[in-house]
Amino acid sequence: MILSGKEILKHIGEDIVIEPFSEERINPNSYNLTLFNELLVYKNETLDMKIPNETEKLIIPEEGLLLEPGKLYLGRTNEFTQTNKYVPMLEGRSSTGRLGLFIHVTAGFGDIGFAGYWTLEIFCVQPIKIYPNTEICQIYYHNIDGEYDLYNSGKYQNNNGIQPSLMYKDFEK
């Protein structure tokens, strides 16, 4: 079952943390998150899962940044989120989707106990200009049935910024 906006609001500061938080961004069953003013792009055209891939930082100026199709941009939310009771899910807003802008390629599913900024896997189907602090995606929360363990992976937990893939660490096990 998905939490309503009113339920999200009720649990803010307790079971759900969203910082900074603005009540104006509550929807009937989600909360709008905003785009930070930095992006990462991979330097090499060919990526390797077994090694750290080099990235380059781009700043999104107030006047906007033009994204190119066929290129992956890693961004992040301005908001730090945490939940110890609900399953967080991230989805692009329909307004961004209707512009051909994808906010996540595969990683829209969060784990109970995740604490950090959401890394966005941004991809566009045609050139599009983006702006910092835009309400770009939404987070919503599911109840979970049964016993569970909190997320405790060290890879992405308590991140401070945009996280490129750390898949290479899986090969070190």
From Swiss-Prot:
Chain positions recorded as dCTP binding sites: 93-98, 111, 119-121, 138, 151
An MF annotation (GO) of this entry: dCTP deaminase (dUMP-forming) activity
GO biological process: dUMP biosynthetic process; dUTP biosynthetic process; nucleobase-containing small molecule interconversion
Reactions catalysed, as given in the entry: dCTP + 2 H2O = dUMP + NH4(+) + diphosphate
Site (Important for bifunctional activity): 108-109
EC number: 3.5.4.30
UniProt pathway: Pyrimidine metabolism; dUMP biosynthesis; dUMP from dCTP: step 1/1
InterPro entries: dCTP_deaminase, dUTPase-like_sf, dUTPase_trimeric
Entry keywords, A to Z: Hydrolase, Nucleotide metabolism, Nucleotide-binding
Domain of life: Bacteria
Catalytic center residues: 121
Described function: Bifunctional enzyme that catalyzes both the deamination of dCTP to dUTP and the hydrolysis of dUTP to dUMP without releasing the toxic dUTP intermediate.
Quaternary structure, from the entry: Homotrimer.
Family: Belongs to the dCTP deaminase family.
PANTHER family documented for this protein: DCTP DEAMINASE
Name of this protein: dCTP deaminase, dUMP-forming
Organism listed in the record: Clostridium botulinum (strain Eklund 17B / Type B)
Gene: dcd
